[in-house]
C-alpha cells in the first residue's frame, strides 16, 4: 500500500450484560475502530476494517431437572459496518469496485437438549440471513491476469449453514 508516513489505531468498545430473569440473559456490545495510515496518496482508513460493529446475544436456559436435564437456547446478531475497499480505480472498468462495501448483518442460533451432566444433543445454524459477498474474487474470469485478486473478502462467502452434534463428557 506504499506506506509513506505514520499509521494509528484507536478503538472504543462498550459492553452491557443484563440478566432479565432466572436463566434469561442478554449481552450487547458495540465496537468502533478508527485505523488510518499515511499513504503516498494521503491519509486513508485501513482497508477491509469496519468502523462500526454491533453484537447482541440472547440466551435462555430452563431450570435443571433430575440428572441436570434442561434446554438451552442461544441467538446471536452481528452487525458489521461498511468497510473501505482497496483502490481499484486503475483497473479496467469491469474490475473496479466501489470505494466502500455495504454493511451487513448475521444471525446465528443454537438449541441444546441436556440429558445429563455427561450427554447433550445440539442443533444450530450460522448466517441464517444467508448473507453472501457478491463476487469475492476480483477478475475471477481471468485467473492469470494482472487484476486477479482473492484478498478482497469483507463478508461471508458461504450461505447459511446448519449443524448438529452430540457432546459426551468423560470423567
Report residues per predicted region.
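Transmembrane beta-barrel architecture of outer membranes
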Residues: 51-55, 106, 161
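Gram-negative outer-membrane beta-barrel transporters
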Residues: 2-85
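Flexible, surface-exposed loop regions and adjacent strand-edge segments
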Residues: 33-34, 42-50, 89-96, 134-147
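Outer-membrane beta-barrel transmembrane domain signature
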Residues: 80, 88-90, 96-108, 114
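Surface-exposed coil/turn segments at beta-strand junctions on protein surfaces, enriched
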Residues: 19-21, 49, 102, 114, ...
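C-terminal beta-signal and adjacent terminal beta-strands/loops
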Residues: 26, 81-88, 112-171
Amino acid at each position: 500500500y506504499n506506506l509513506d508516513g505514520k499509521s494509528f489505531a484507536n478503538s472504543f468498545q462498550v459492553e452491557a450484560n443484563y440478566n432479565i430473569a432466572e436463566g434469561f440473559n442478554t449481552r450487547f456490545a458495540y465496537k468502533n475502530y478508527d485505523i488510518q495510515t499515511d499513504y503516498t496518496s494521503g491519509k486513508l482508513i485501513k482497508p477491509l476494517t469496519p468502523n462500526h460493529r454491533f453484537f447482541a446475544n440472547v440466551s435462555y436456559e430452563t431450570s435443571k431437572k433430575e440428572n441436570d436435564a434442561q434446554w438451552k437456547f442461544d441467538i446471536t446478531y452481528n452487525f458489521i459496518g461498511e468497510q473501505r475497499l482497496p483502490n481499484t480505480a486503475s483497473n479496467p472498468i469491469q474490475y473496479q469496485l466501489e470505494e466502500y462495501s455495504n454493511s451487513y448483518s448475521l444471525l446465528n442460533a443454537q438449541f441444546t437438549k441436556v440429558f445429563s451432566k455427561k450427554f447433550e444433543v445440539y442443533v444450530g445454524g450460522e448466517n441464517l440471513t444467508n448473507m453472501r459477498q457478491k463476487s469475492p474474487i476480483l477478475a475471477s474470469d481471468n485467473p492469470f491476469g494482472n487484476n486477479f485478486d482473492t484478498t478482497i473478502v469483507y463478508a461471508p462467502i458461504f450461505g447459511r449453514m446448519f449443524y448438529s452434534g452430540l457432546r459426551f463428557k468423560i470423567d
